[in-house]
């Protein structure tokens, strides 16, 4: 085997290891969850297992999604760790899956798909993620108010024991130009009750009075005992 052949194989392996950075890869990864949660049920039935599971759980609105991946070479910067800018692509995928699942019933039964634009994002970078290092991204709703839904995402390594980054995202539910109140959306999905309302109220107070989009330590230690994976 010649040197050129070896080089070609090594280069091919390098490209394969960076599949997340290939043209179009982002759209494939993002729309995989959109198709899975919103388009396939059109053929398999609107009463999905996800909807049934959430409705049976009194804390269903606080369920989380988890994405397992790794830092590919093209995602790393000149400091030889995952570039800060690449965190947001993973956030799109993780949060997109979460919102499609939590509000799946609303979206499937609406005449027009409501959409959920991002209003604000804050990310606190705590520890580096090295090239080829495996990590997980988990996202869950932590609270809401009359208009906004607040989602917390955690980047962790070593099976969730080490927090590398924490992100807060502010969402709004829209039906055309009309804003859908989070409470109304959760009630429609069968996920609203007094217990989750109290948790949301406490977390919102923590977010606005002790944290905001600048200090995240109290949120890093936020209880997850009532959260389950979906």
Curated annotation (Swiss-Prot):
This protein's UniProt keywords: Transferase
GO cellular component, one term: endoplasmic reticulum
Top-level taxon in the UniProt lineage: Eukaryota
GO molecular-function terms, A-Z: transferase activity
Gene3D superfamilies, per database record: Hotdog Thioesterase (3.10.129.10)
EC number: 2.3.1.-
Matching InterPro entries: HotDog_dom_sf, THEM6_lcsJ_thioesterase
Additional remarks: Present with 1950 molecules/cell in log phase SD medium.
Family from the record: Belongs to the lcsJ thioesterase family.
Protein name per UniProt: Probable thioesterase YBR096W
Organism field: Saccharomyces cerevisiae (strain ATCC 204508 / S288c)
